[in-house]
Amino acid sequence: MKTRTYFLTALAAALTLVTGHTLASPPSVPTVEVLAMTHPPVKMALAPLREWFAAQGKKLKVVETDIESPQGEKRLAAVGLNGHIPIVILIDGQYRHKRKDGSTIEFLNFPDIPGAPSGVRGKWTTADVQAVLTERMKQP
């Protein structure tokens, strides 16, 4: 039994030296799905958020999907939504999140920015998405 334990310990040490990684689980990287229309107003509304995503590098996994494509419609339905929704931001598969003050926020429709169409203006901002992701990136 000691031989087996010694062998497994030596194997783990060798793998760590060769790969540079431990056998412990790697830290979880948040997945952000941006389901959005590809029209100019949507692109402009999401530009600051996309720039922030890019600045995070490998701390985030970002997946972009045209919400009007068959794949986008299928993903929208998978999270229980349908209809004319120009933007959905999913963080680890969820569009509803808790703020630090305990209130719930939904990352649906346009962010609450000047010039956003009133009928599809959400109650979220780029800072809200950043706050949720910043907290999420701190988690192991």
Language model segments and positions:
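Bacterial N-terminal signal peptides that target proteins for export
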Residues: 1-9
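Bacterial N-terminal signal peptides
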Residues: 9-18
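Sec/Tat signal peptide C-region and signal peptidase I cleavage site
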Residues: 19-24
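Local sequence-structure signature of Cys/Sec-based thiol-disulfide redox active-site neighborhoods
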Residues: 25-56
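Second-shell loop/turn segments in exported
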Residues: 34-40, 63-64, 113-123
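Extracytoplasmic/secreted envelope proteins and their assembly/folding machinery
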Residues: 43-53, 69, 73-76, 126, ...
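Thiol-based oxidoreductase modules, predominantly thioredoxin-like and allied folds used
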Residues: 58-72
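Non-catalytic, surface beta->alpha helical segment in thiol-disulfide oxidoreductase systems
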Residues: 91-139
